[in-house]
From Swiss-Prot:
The lineage of its organism: Bacteria, Bacillati, Cyanobacteriota, Cyanophyceae, Synechococcales. One of its GO terms (cellular component) is cytosolic large ribosomal subunit. It comes from the Bacteria. It comes from Prochlorococcus marinus (strain NATL2A). GO terms for molecular function: rRNA binding; structural constituent of ribosome. PANTHER family: 60S/50S RIBOSOMAL PROTEIN L6/L9, LARGE RIBOSOMAL SUBUNIT PROTEIN UL6M. This is Large ribosomal subunit protein uL6. Coiled coil: none annotated. The gene is rplF.
Amino acid sequence: MSRTGKKPISLPEKVDVKFEGLSITVKGPKGELKRTLPNGVSLSKDENFIFVKPINEKRQSREMHGLCRSLVANMVEGVSNGFTKKLEIVGVGSRAQVKGKTLVVSAGYSHPVEVVPPEGITFKVENNTNVIVTGPDKELVGNEAAKIRAIRPPEPYKGKGIKYQGELIIRKAGKSGKT
């Protein structure tokens, strides 16, 4: 049995959970999330806790047990507190700004790159170089942050590009001249 899957998921007061079979809907102050879980697990609710249990001892049920528990816990966390990813833009002339809901990134190309957020995701820019991606869905927030980082990944020689806040870029030595 999965150690992660054994833990009950506590529900905050403002969060409402409904499940029909393997589809689960979680509503909270930050939004509403829906997901269909894979076969092999069952969900049960007891007062302020959700329990995820494998339906049998087959390998697939055991594999999905911890995964489904983590997915449901992330949904509950997302609709109550939300998730954020912070990115830093490093380099002369590289900057970002928000126009309407669209993020416009100038990253050294001949044209600015526009990123349109999916529903529920918001972009915020601080000091033209720090981008904050927020939303209730952990997977979507991470995917959008990865898309923004992929516009200009950090290069190892000078460290220019778009990186996650706190990300360590391994630097390489440049060419050594003739002596």
